[in-house]
From Swiss-Prot:
Further details from the record: Vaccination against the protein protects mice from different Leishmania species, such as Leishmania major and Leishmania braziliensis, when infection occurs in the presence of L.longipalpis salivary gland homogenates or after L.longipalpis bites.
Record organism: Lutzomyia longipalpis (Sand fly)
Top-level lineage group: Eukaryota
Protein's name in the database: Yellow-related salivary protein LJM11
UniProt-annotated glycosylation sites, renumbered to this chain: N213
C-alpha cells in the first residue's frame, strides 16, 4: 500500500465575531492508495462537499475537468483524522461505496438528504479530449444516490436524464433534495437541479420516475459578476445557481429559496408549485443583499431560521434571518471573513447544526485553473453550531 503525505492541514481559526472556526486547507489534493506520479495534483479541483455528521464522513466532489483524476467522489474519515490535535493529516480516499473509482464519470456536487442518502449528479462525460478520456464511461447525465445508513454505502438510485432534457450538463450548479416525509419510507422525494447557463431548473420526481425542466425570468442573471485576481478584474455571468429548502408545512411542502450566481436578489417559491409538472410558478421576491454581494451557494438552517451565503468576491460568509423581512442589507451580517477565503463555492448546515463553508479559488472563468495563490487555495471551514455563528449579529433574534 502506497501512502504519502498531502499538503493538507487542519487549523483552528478565530472567526470575525469570535466564533471558533475549525477548518481544513489544501494547497493540493492528494490521494491515499494511489501511486504518486499516476496523476497530476494540479488537476485535482474540488468544487463542493457534503458532511455526514452521524457517520463523521466528509465527501468531496472532484470533477474530471482535467485529465487523470483518480476519484471524482472522494471521502475523508474525520473521526480518525483529528487534524485539530496536529498529528496526521488525512489524504483523500476512494468513496466507500465504490470498488474502482470509475462508477461515476464526473460530479460537481454531493448532497445528503434527511434520510441519510448521498446524492450526486453524474454529468456523464469528462471535459477533455486528451489521452485517457476514453477510460471513463460516457453516458447521459444521471442522478445517483447511496444509502449512508447501510454498510459500504450501496447505490439505491440511478436515474438517467431523458435525452430531450439534457442541455449543457457541465453547467449544472447546486441542487436540493426534497423529502416530503423523512419519517416515512422516503420514497416521495424530489430533486431540484439548477442550470446556470440556461437559467433553468431540472426537476426529478423519484416516486413517479419522471422529470421535467422549468424556467422563469427570475432564474436569469441580473448582470455580470466581477472577480478580482492578480490586480485584474474578470467577469462571469451565471443564472440560477444556489437553491436551499426551508421548513415543511403540514402537507410536506416548503419554500425553496434561490438566487442567480450573478445577482443580489433572493427569491422563494413553494415546492408545491415545483412538484406540479406543467404548473405555473409564482415566485416571491424577498429582497436584495446589497451591491457586489453575489453568491453561488446558500444554506438554510431550520434551528435559527437563518440563510447563510458563501460569497463570490467579498471573501466572506454572510447571513440573513428569514424572520426579518424584507431582505435588505441592514438586515444582513457577516459571520466569517478571511483574505484567503477566495471564491466561496459551497455551504451547508449538517444534521447536528454545524455550519460548513468552502472556497476553492476557481470562479467560472476561462482558464481559472491556472490562477496561482501563495496560500492554500482550498479552504473548508466549520463553525460547530449555527447559533454560535450568528451570536451578536443582525441575524440573531436574541441580540
Amino acid at each position: 500500500m502506497k501512502v504519502f503525505f498531502s499538503i493538507f492541514t487542519l487549523v483552528l481559526f478565530q472567526g470575525t465575531l469570535g466564533a471558533d472556526t475549525q477548518g481544513y486547507k489544501w494547497k493540493q489534493l492528494l490521494y491515499n492508495n494511489v501511486t504518486p506520479g499516476s496523476y497530476n495534483p494540479d488537476n485535482m479541483i474540488s468544487t463542493a462537499f457534503a458532511y455526514d455528521a452521524e457517520g463523521e464522513k466528509l465527501f468531496l466532489a472532484v470533477p474530471r475537468k482535467l485529465p487523470r483524476v483518480p476519484y471524482t467522489l472522494a471521502e475523508v474519515d474525520t473521526k480518525n483524522s483529528l487534524g485539530v490535535k496536529g498529528k496526521h493529516s488525512p489524504l483523500l480516499n476512494k468513496f466507500s461505496g465504490h470498488k474502482t473509482g470509475k462508477e461515476l464519470t464526473s460530479i460537481y456536487q454531493p448532497v445528503i438528504d434527511d434520510c441519510r442518502r448521498l446524492w450526486v449528479v453524474d454529468i456523464g462525460s469528462v471535459e477533455y479530449r486528451s489521452r485517457g478520456a476514453k477510460d471513463y464511461p460516457s453516458h447521459r447525465p444521471a442522478i445517483v444516490a447511496y444509502d449512508l445508513k447501510q454498510p459500504n454505502y450501496p447505490e439505491v438510485v440511478r436515474y438517467y436524464f431523458p435525452t430531450r432534457l439534457v442541455e449543457k450538463p457541465t453547467y449544472f450548479g447546486g441542487f436540493a433534495v426534497d423529502v416530503a416525509n423523512p419519517k416515512g419510507d422516503c420514497s416521495e422525494t424530489f430533486v431540484y437541479i439548477t442550470n446556470f447557463l440556461r437559467g433553468a431548473l431540472f426537476i426529478y420526481d423519484h416516486k413517479k420516475q419522471d422529470s421535467w425542466n422549468v424556467t422563469h425570468p427570475t432564474f436569469k442573471a441580473e448582470r455580470p459578476t466581477k472577480f478580482d485576481y492578480g490586480g485584474k478584474e474578470y467577469e462571469f455571468k451565471a443564472g440560477i445557481f444556489g437553491i436551499t429548502l426551508g421548513d415543511r408545512d403540514s402537507e410536506g411542502n416548503r419554500p425553496a429559496y434561490y438566487l442567480a450566481g450573478s445577482a443580489i436578489k433572493v427569491y422563494s417559491v413553494n415546492t408545491k408549485e415545483l412538484k406540479q409538472k406543467g404548473g405555473k410558478l409564482n415566485p416571491e421576491l424577498l429582497g436584495n443583499r446589497g451591491k457586489y454581494n453575489d453568491a453561488i451557494a446558500l444554506a438554510y438552517d431550520p434551528k435559527t431560521k437563518v440563510i447563510f451565503f458563501a460569497e463570490a468576491n467579498t471573501k466572506q460568509v454572510s447571513c440573513w434571518n428569514t424572520q426579518k423581512m424584507p431582505l435588505r442589507m441592514k438586515n444582513t451580517d457577516v459571520v466569517y471573513t478571511s483574505s484567503r477565503f477566495v471564491f466561496g463555492t459551497d455551504i451547508s448546515v449538517d444534521s447536528k447544526g454545524g455550519l460548513w463553508f468552502m472556497s476553492n479559488g476557481f470562479p467560472p472563468i476561462r482558464k481559472s485553473e491556472k490562477f496561482k495563490y501563495d496560500f492554500p487555495r482550498y479552504r473548508l471551514m466549520r463553525i460547530m453550531d449555527t447559533q454560535e455563528a450568528i451570536a451578536g449579529t443582525a441575524c440573531d433574534m436574541n441580540a
